[in-house]
């Protein structure tokens, strides 16, 4: 398939708000992709580079586009040719790699027409937001393959990504999907929680009775045991086994030889309250001397879900059954504190106890809900003391006075799941230490998509920041019609992706509640 054809599909998908029309356009594109192009094409239609980041920043891309000759006419580039070129760019390393990447990029752009260049630029910078979200694309894959959409979504959940599932489903149908199952030793994306304004609202939303568990201020982990082999993965599915020998020892001591558990690892003070999140995260650095750090900064694991236990997979089992399996596998002192109740006063007291012990709050869970890996579903609702949201930095302004020379005033946005875009909710320069200002300036400069000498610098929407605020008010200034009151930065969440940010629906729910 020609890149120009895929770029036109992307443009058409972005132009229509109708979900069914998006599915129809994507279905036709998937049919036209050659078998060896399907995984790449599906990835690009979802706005992701098939091979990951290629090491080309906004400044390099802008310079290459400015230097490129007039857009090419003629047969143009194929999807396969472009994928191969991007993989060569990504693989360039060592002395001279920057120049090598630029040569490959120049050669690619020289063969591309203007629509192809626009598509490539957005794809490389992570800005291809066309509304072809995984749910829509999953429906398109299901339509072309003649399979139930739920089966495609489940396979994508277990694979951690849709493109390999699309390739298998389109080539082999149901037999291809059957290969995607939960395997001990291979991580799956964790289930996530939506935000509720309070425990009363959470109980009402979950039907009156729910399980409430402390929301620990630690690092999310997924621990796998197969006999003596234990592997531990982070929230982002990076293997961190070497960083957490305490977790490895705990699982090896468990009475069951086959386990996949979901939980948190946290550094605790002598009184049992948590160390700051940043302190816990020191144990997860990429350059790590565990033997030196562990004695002074031990980690304690607390688990709250069982995905495999009792000899079988439990993803589809109700939450109450998964908890019962966890009780049989892990001692009480290594499970999160939990209360099953339908009494709002009892739930509020449980929340206050968690907050008094220094934890973030509670998570309310529907007792009959399955484990929906990779989804921020309505079956889990998190409640914190002060309102906080995980938002994405969209731009930053240069500071003045004491903050001169630092990118200071952050533009903050919530995710719109309908479009894949981010909806701005306001700005803040509050809550930042000098160290944070220095760090974010360098990080945001690397993400810049516009000139650094302008007073306002737009950036790729990649940094997730936890923001506290006092309330939400109507505001005609911003596209979503809402703004945060007295927003201040609590911390950056480098363990979260932009897709993990809170949604504009969550913000509207908090405003309406």
Swiss-Prot record:
Its cofactor is Mg(2+). Keywords: ATP-binding, Cell cycle, Cell division, DNA damage, DNA recombination, DNA repair, DNA replication, Ligase, Magnesium, Metal-binding, Nucleotide-binding. It comes from the Bacteria. The keyword Ribosomal protein does not apply. GO terms for biological process: cell division; DNA biosynthetic process; DNA recombination; DNA repair; DNA replication. ATP binds at residues 213, 220, 235, 264, 304, 376, 382. InterPro entries: ATP-dep_DNA_ligase, DNA_ligae_ATP-dep_bac/arc, DNA_ligase_ATP-dep, DNA_ligase_ATP-dep_C, DNA_ligase_ATP-dep_cent, DNA_ligase_ATP-dep_CS, DNA_ligase_ATP-dep_N, DNA_ligase_N_sf. SUPFAM superfamilies: ATP-dependent DNA ligase DNA-binding domain, DNA ligase/mRNA capping enzyme, catalytic domain, Nucleic acid-binding proteins. The active site is at residue 215. Gene3D superfamilies: DNA ligase, ATP-dependent, N-terminal domain, DNA ligase/mRNA capping enzyme, Nucleic acid-binding proteins. PROSITE patterns: DNA_LIGASE_A1 (PS00697), DNA_LIGASE_A2 (PS00333), DNA_LIGASE_A3 (PS50160). Its EC number is 6.5.1.1. GO terms for molecular function: ATP binding; DNA binding; DNA ligase (ATP) activity; metal ion binding. DNA ligase that seals nicks in double-stranded DNA during DNA replication, DNA recombination and DNA repair. Belongs to the ATP-dependent DNA ligase family. This is Probable DNA ligase. It comes from Anaeromyxobacter sp. (strain K). The gene is lig.
């Amino acid at each position: 398939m020609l890149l120009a054809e895929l770029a036109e599909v992307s443009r058409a998908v972005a132009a229509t708000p109708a979900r069914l029309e998006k599915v129809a356009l994507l279905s036709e594109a998937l049919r036209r992709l050659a078998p060896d192009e399907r995984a790449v094409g599906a990835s690009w239609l979802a706005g992701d580079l098939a091979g990951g980041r290629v090491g080309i920043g906004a400044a390099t891309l802008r310079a290459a586009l400015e230097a490129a000759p007039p857009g090419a006419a003629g047969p143009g580039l194929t999807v396969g040719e472009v994928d191969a070129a991007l993989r060569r760019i990504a693989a360039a390393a060592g002395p001279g790699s920057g120049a090598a990447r630029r040569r490959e990029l120049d050669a690619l752009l020289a063969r591309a027409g203007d629509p192809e260049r626009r598509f490539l630029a957005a794809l490389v910078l992570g800005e291809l937001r066309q509304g072809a979200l995984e749910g829509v694309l999953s429906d398109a894959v299901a339509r072309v393959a003649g399979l139930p959409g739920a089966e495609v979504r489940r396979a994508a959940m277990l694979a951690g990504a849709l493109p390999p599932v699309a390739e298998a489903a389109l080539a082999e149908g149901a037999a291809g999907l059957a290969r995607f199952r939960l395997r001990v030793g291979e991580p799956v994306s964790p289930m996530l929680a939506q935000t509720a304004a309070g425990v009363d609202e959470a109980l009402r939303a979950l039907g009156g009775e729910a399980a409430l568990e402390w929301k620990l201020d630690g690092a999310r982990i997924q621990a796998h045991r197969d006999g003596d082999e234990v592997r531990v993965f982070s929230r982002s599915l990076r293997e961190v086994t070497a960083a957490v020998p305490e977790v490895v020892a705990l699982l090896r001591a468990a009475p069951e030889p086959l386990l996949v558990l979901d939980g948190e690892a946290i550094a605790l003070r002598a009184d049992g309250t948590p160390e700051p999140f940043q302190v816990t995260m020191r144990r997860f650095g990429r350059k790590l001397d565990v033997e030196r750090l562990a004695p002074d900064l031990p980690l304690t694991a607390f688990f709250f879900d069982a995905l495999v236990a009792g000899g079988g997979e439990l993803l589809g089992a109700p939450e109450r059954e998964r908890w019962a399996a966890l009780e049989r596998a892990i001692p009480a002192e290594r499970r999160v504190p939990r209360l099953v109740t339908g009494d709002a006063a009892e739930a509020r007291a449980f929340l206050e106890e968690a907050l008094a012990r220094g934890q973030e709050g509670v998570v309310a869970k529907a007792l009959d809900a399955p484990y929906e890996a990779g989804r921020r579903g309505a079956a889990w609702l998190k409640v914190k003391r002060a309102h906080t949201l995980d938002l994405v930095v969209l731009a930053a302004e240069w500071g003045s006075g004491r903050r001169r020379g630092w990118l200071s005033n952050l533009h903050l946005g919530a995710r719109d799941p309908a479009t894949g875009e981010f909806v701005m909710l306001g700005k803040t320069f509050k809550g930042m230490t000098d160290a944070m200002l220095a760090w974010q300036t360098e990080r945001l400069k690397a993400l810049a998509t516009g000139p650094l000498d302008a007073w306002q610098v737009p950036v790729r929407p990649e940094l997730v920041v936890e923001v506290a605020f006092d309330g939400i008010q109507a505001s005609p200034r911003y596209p979503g019609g809402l703004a945060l009151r007295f927003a201040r930065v609590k911390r950056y969440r480098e363990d979260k992706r932009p897709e993990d940010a809170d949604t504009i629906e969550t913000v509207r729910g908090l405003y309406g509640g």
